Amino acid sequence: DSPGGASDAQKQHDVNSILXKVYXEI
């Protein structure tokens, strides 16, 4: 398991969170 994978998953989670906020405002 490389730390890059965990970091990637975390970034993906952050992106999903931001997208949800943006869509909620639209």
Curated annotation (Swiss-Prot):
Gene Ontology molecular-function annotations: oxygen carrier activity
Subcellular location as annotated: Secreted, Extracellular space
A GO CC annotation given for this chain: extracellular region
Annotated tissue distribution: Hemolymph.
An individual GO BP term: oxygen transport
Disulphides: none
Keywords: Copper, Oxygen transport, Secreted, Transport
Protein function: Hemocyanins are copper-containing oxygen carriers occurring freely dissolved in the hemolymph of many mollusks and arthropods.
Family listed: Belongs to the tyrosinase family. Hemocyanin subfamily.
Name of this chain's protein: Hemocyanin subunit B
Lineage, broadest ranks: Eukaryota, Metazoa, Ecdysozoa, Arthropoda, Crustacea
